[in-house]
Amino acid sequence: MVERARADRKRIVLPEGEDDRVLRAAGRVLRRGIADLVILGDESDIRSRAAELSVDLTAAVVLNPANSDMRDEFAAQYLEMRRAKGMTIERAQEIMADVSYFGTMLVHNGIVGGMVSGATHTTAHTVRPAFEIIRTQPDVSTVSSVFLMCLSDRVLAYGDCAIVPDPTADQLADIAISSARTAAKFGIDPRVAMLSYSTGDSGTGAGVDKVRAATDLVRRRDPNLLVDGPIQYDAAVDPTVAGAKMPGSPVAGRATVLIFPDLNTGNNTYKAVQRSAGAIAIGPVLQGLNKPVNDLSRGALIEDIVNTVAITAIQAQGN
């Protein structure tokens, strides 16, 4: 992944220049040649703190939205985007002092290839500007996310663990197809497991019925995609359990893309695997936006941030 990012190096914006993890991660990104960086915040404070941390940010550009020459232009653009919503130029200028909005406008204008945020900001604070400014791809109705879970013996894609709280069957099908495409982009051969508390026909209930309906929708929309469900996690990833619970399945026991039925399940599962099994969790990688914006967990480790920058840089290569 790092080699792919280096091969066609892109510029990524990090809006949270006040966070030590972000500064340390920025130093690693620059040292390893993963991406060029723009860091947002007060330049004097950021460079002073970097020196205290023994982090070399010489190669980074530091911009302060509060006094940037681009603020007025970004405010004028945002006013046009949101005029129908009652936006005023005064309010637009105020909004453009916000690092999340300013960073998103850098992406929108092609000044940077993508944005990584969320170490100190909520998911909503990171994602809302992207919805308003960058917007969704024409053929996508559901913006969702995946985590790339790097275990000791494999890499799995988990979706959706960050965006859609309680997806409908239709949204769940969108998430599955988008997640399979994202997985393939990063070298994972997609075999999609639609997770539930029931495997096959062993259980009933509204939750199982939703997953079953979503599985049928995926098969109709993308007939060439290997998908199965409803299926429990153990049957999805363990060949022995799969042989007992779902023999003959092209996915069971070999799943690489695991689709959770709701955000409660997905978010807690990725964190449990990350913290208890020592997996590296890269993401959430957002799917469906016109340009890449990726959200960090507020508990993100330094290497999580580095990896997410690499992911974002690779996504930017596609643009």
Language model features with spans:
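Anion-binding alpha/beta catalytic cores of soluble intermediary-metabolism enzymes, centered on
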Residues: 1-252, 257-319
